[in-house]
Amino acid sequence: MFEAKKSAKATLRMIKISPRKLNLITGLIRNLKVSDAIMQLKFSKKRAAVDVKKCLQSAIANAENNDGLDIDNLVVLKAIVGKGSVMKRLVPRARGKAFRIKKFFSNLYITVSEIK
């Protein structure tokens, strides 16, 4: 879609939210300009938007400081959500029983690149 010159990456691991919920937010910012993506995340009411915004700002800082890219020409090239580890916990139930619940974690990988 875009002709990418250089790119910069940022990762955020072990986010305490399920990958399914996190993927809803990352779908909003894929293939957007960085300024538009930040505005989209700023006004989103989802809890995951805070973590995605944090990772996106880290990718922007990496692009500016490490690779010397121009912030005005940056585009979110990839926003990938991966499955993290799962914590298993017990919840006490009636008659001395206990049920197992799973607490899901996610990994987030964001790549921004400079376009012409």
Swiss-Prot record:
Q: Is the keyword Ribonucleoprotein assigned to this protein?
A: yes
A GO molecular function annotation here is: structural constituent of ribosome
Q: Which InterPro entries does UniProt cross-reference here? A: Ribosomal_uL22 (IPR001063), Ribosomal_uL22_bac/chlpt-type (IPR005727), Ribosomal_uL22_bac/org-type (IPR047867), Ribosomal_uL22_CS (IPR018260), Ribosomal_uL22_sf (IPR036394)
- Give any single GO term for biological process: translation
What highest taxon heads this organism's lineage?
Answer: Bacteria
Keyword terms: Ribonucleoprotein, Ribosomal protein, RNA-binding, rRNA-binding
Taken from the UniProt entry, a GO cellular component term is: cytosolic large ribosomal subunit
Recorded hits in CDD domains, A to Z, give: Ribosomal_L22
Q: Does the keyword RNA-binding apply?
A: yes
Q: Which family does it belong to?
A: Belongs to the universal ribosomal protein uL22 family.
Stated role: This protein binds specifically to 23S rRNA; its binding is stimulated by other ribosomal proteins, e.g. L4, L17, and L20. It is important during the early stages of 50S assembly. It makes multiple contacts with different domains of the 23S rRNA in the assembled 50S subunit and ribosome. The globular domain of the protein is located near the polypeptide exit tunnel on the outside of the subunit, while an extended beta-hairpin is found that lines the wall of the exit tunnel in the center of the 70S ribosome.
Its subunit composition reads: Part of the 50S ribosomal subunit.
Q: What is this protein called?
A: Large ribosomal subunit protein uL22
Give the gene that encodes this protein: rplV
